[in-house]
A protein has these predicted regions:
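Core catalytic alpha/beta fold that binds nucleotide/phospho-ligands
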Residues: 1-130
Length: 130
């Protein structure tokens, strides 16, 4: 197995939370049902940092695949996992097609938040396609 790509993204939690408050439809556009299931989203003080980290994970996934993916929806990348569990990426649609065409067989995700920032790091591996 070979590392095919690495992506990282960082999000300012307060700025991201303000954007969600200003534009209520943004939350539905960026996040699907899997993204919004975790218990930590029920606590208002944790929801902003959790959603910011999930958005960073989506951006990091796109970067790990090389970016420039046309015909994708933000719902094509969803993050699963409850507090204390290893988060996982669920791919579908255009992003899943791009991953398959690139030879991706597994993804690895790490997310964190501190000091008002949320960060996500994604590694994709598999067998390169020619």
């Amino acid at each position: 197995m070979t590392v095919l790509g690495v992506g990282v993204d960082i999000v300012d939690i307060e700025r991201f939370t303000r954007a969600l408050e200003r534009t209520p439809a943004l939350r539905q556009r960026l996040f699907g049902p899997v993204d919004t299931q975790p218990q930590d989203l029920a606590a208002q003080d944790l929801a902003g940092q959790s959603l910011a980290a999930r958005f960073a994970a989506k951006e990091a996934m796109l970067k790990a695949l090389g970016g420039n993916i046309s015909g994708f929806s933000w719902h094509d990348i969803q993050v699963t996992g409850e507090r204390g569990q290893q988060p996982k990426l669920v791919l579908s649609g255009g992003v899943a097609r791009r991953a398959a065409l690139s030879g991706v067989t597994s993804t690895h995700l790490s997310m964190s938040h501190d000091g008002g920032m949320a960060i996500a790091f994604v590694v994709v591996d598999g067998e390169p396609r020619s």
